[in-house]
């Protein structure tokens, strides 16, 4: 996609790379599907970078505005899917 991901310039380069991978995984869940463990592993790393619920909601809102994809909905779907199954929105 051709849009700018929500990034915090206080994050380290490694954290920014992780966040971009996480955003790409959310896109993949919507566009093609992604293995549950891959998405949940990136979500766990996302939560290490963004531990605050309020900040998570803010990032989700910003991401949804630029992409049309909801982080919250994708993660909720992943939690419902069995292990080793595809998460597809």
From Swiss-Prot:
Check the record and name the Gene3D superfamilies matching this protein.
BH2638-like
Q: Which SUPFAM superfamilies does its entry note?
A: BH2638-like
InterPro entries reported in the protein's UniProt record: BH2638-like_sf, UPF0223
> In terms of domain of life, where is this protein from?
Bacteria
The family line of this record is: Belongs to the UPF0223 family.
Q: Can you name this protein?
A: UPF0223 protein BC_3961
């Amino acid at each position: 996609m051709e849009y700018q991901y929500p990034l915090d310039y206080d994050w380290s380069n490694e954290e920014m790379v992780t966040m971009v991978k996480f955003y790409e995984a959310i896109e993949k869940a919507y566009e093609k599907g992604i293995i549950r463990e891959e998405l949940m592993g990136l979500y766990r790393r996302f939560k290490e970078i963004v531990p605050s619920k309020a900040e998570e909601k803010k990032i989700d809102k910003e991401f949804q505005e630029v992409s049309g994809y909801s982080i919250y909905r994708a993660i909720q779907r992943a939690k419902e899917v069995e292990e080793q199954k595809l998460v597809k929105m």
